[in-house]
Regions:
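Low-complexity, serine/threonine/proline-enriched polar segments
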Residues: 1-3
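Auxiliary Fe-S-binding modules of radical SAM enzymes
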Residues: 112, 130-295
Length: 295
């Protein structure tokens, strides 16, 4: 971890206060490669993270209900919902288990019951041509599991995937407006069923939108962020607690429909091309002044 960070010293656009801050590990995302919940010592590992006041964001694909039922308290529990129907899920995920759909349904039931104390989040990664249809079936899953929040994100193109059965191109990557349209339709379907959800926050730069249970709307303001010190305080108290016990108010710039669209106004985007033009303009101005002095 530290070796990777050190390589960034001196890179244009790096803020030194952020660079120094990165040497203090604060969050751990248990995701990306493999299935973390299938690791036999996952609870012990999460406990080790918490002892160091490192938050735990665990992502699972809802294929191991027994392991999910035994999972200890984590800061946030993600469940990847990759497709809305059995047919589509088989196409997208190419699951190893023949009873993959039954496993998924069991995990959704566990979220609503045994793991209802957790801060649970559905994660939907939208891929055009694969999983952006059938809003009603997605709503069925939400109604069954009752997650705390639903995070919808447009897929990011990482190069060609030819040869793996699902060749993706830029044509499969949705625009932000397409993601917004999907979320608005899903939200409308949820509300038509009497489910107490609404669109809470967005980060347009990441093509990401958050739908949340309205219980996170406190005194007229969304509280979808996490109060990390409070989480560890509650954890160390030994008392039982739920997702609402460690919430933090959502910044105004992150709220759905805000002018900032999720971009923190305290940050500035580093534009390499703009920086080059700026430096060139400075050099040209200096050369002009030098020429005038010589004349």
């Amino acid at each position: 971890h530290y070796q990777k960070i050190k390589q960034l010293r001196g890179v244009p656009g790096i803020q030194m206060d952020r660079f120094e801050e990165a040497f203090k590990v604060r969050h751990c995302a248990l995701s990306l490669v493999g299935e973390p919940i299938f690791y036999p010592y996952i609870n012990e590992f999460v406990g080790m993270l918490h002892e160091q006041h490192i938050s735990s964001f665990l992502v699972c694909n809802a294929q191991h209900p027994d392991s999910l039922a035994k999972l200890t308290k984590v800061t946030q529990l993600y469940v990847s919902i990759d497709a809305p129907t059995k047919k589509d899920l088989k196409k997208v995920d190419r699951p190893l288990n023949s009873d993959f759909w039954e496993r998924l349904m069991s995990c959704l039931d566990i979220l609503r019951t045994i793991q209802s104390h957790q801060r649970t989040v559905f994660r939907l990664t939208l891929v055009k041509g694969f999983n952006m249809e059938d809003i009603e079936s997605y709503a069925d899953m939400v109604e069954r599991a009752k997650p705390s929040q639903i995070e919808i994100k447009g897929a990011t193109f990482c190069g060609s995937s030819n040869g793996n059965g699902n060749p993706l191109t830029m044509q499969n990557i949705p625009f932000y407006e397409e993601c917004k349209n999907f979320v608005e339709n899903l939200n409308k379907e949820l509300q038509s069923r009497g489910l107490d959800y609404d669109i809470a926050a967005e980060h347009a730069h990441s093509c990401c939108i958050l739908v949340a249970d309205k219980k996170f709307m406190i005194n007229g303001k969304w509280h979808t962020h996490i109060d990390y010190p409070k989480f560890f305080e509650l954890l160390e108290s030994g008392k039982e607690f739920v997702d609402l016990d460690y919430v933090k108010e959502t910044p105004e710039w992150a709220v759905w429909g805000s002018q900032g669209a999720g971009f923190n106004p305290e940050d500035t985007k580093y534009d390499r091309k703009a920086e080059k033009l700026k430096k060139k303009a400075i050099r040209d101005e200096q050369a002009k002044k030098l020429l005038e002095q010589q004349q």
